[in-house]
């Protein structure tokens, strides 16, 4: 299973880098539940310096508030794993990066920490590109923590590829 994910990462991330180079676009990430894996996958490819601008791991609520200026009231009312928080993360990332494409990721990797309303495997992926901004919600069930992170990273890559093409 690890080899399959590795192959997917390398193939899809290389496709993404080539597409971004071709279109002369830069990308930045604000990660929470993926813990820097997204940025790591991109920068493990040769040529990534031409397209990768910024990678932030804002794992704690405090980091989200301090670095990405996510309002305390958003986290208190909706939680760090919410559409509202993800939207705030991607919007504010776009203000501090030098990128055309900005992506935010927040979720519950597990194996603990989930609730009935927000189960383990829940993830929100925010994307801002040109005038478009959206947040997608996914639920990846019955996955280990690392597999959840890998599936999330692959979903981000596929999402960016589909939006930029």
Regions found by a protein language model. Give the residues of each.
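Short alpha-helical segments enriched in small residues
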Residues: 4-165
């Amino acid at each position: 299973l690890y080899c399959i994910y590795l192959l997917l990462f390398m193939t899809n991330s290389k496709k993404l880098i080539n597409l971004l180079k071709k279109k002369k676009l830069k990308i930045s990430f604000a990660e929470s539940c993926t813990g820097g894996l997204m940025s790591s996958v991109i920068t493990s490819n040769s040529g990534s310096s031409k397209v990768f601008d910024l990678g932030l791991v804002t794992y704690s609520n405090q980091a989200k508030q301090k670095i990405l200026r996510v309002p305390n009231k958003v986290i208190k009312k909706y939680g760090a794993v919410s559409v509202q928080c993800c939207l705030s993360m991607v919007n504010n990332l776009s203000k501090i990066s030098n990128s055309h494409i900005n992506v935010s990721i927040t979720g519950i990797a597990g194996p603990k920490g989930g609730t009935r309303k927000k189960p383990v495997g829940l993830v929100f992926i925010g994307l801002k590109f040109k005038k478009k901004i959206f947040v997608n919600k996914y639920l990846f069930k019955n996955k280990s923590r690392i597999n959840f992170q890998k599936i999330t990273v692959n979903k981000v890559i596929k999402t960016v590829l589909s939006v930029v093409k």
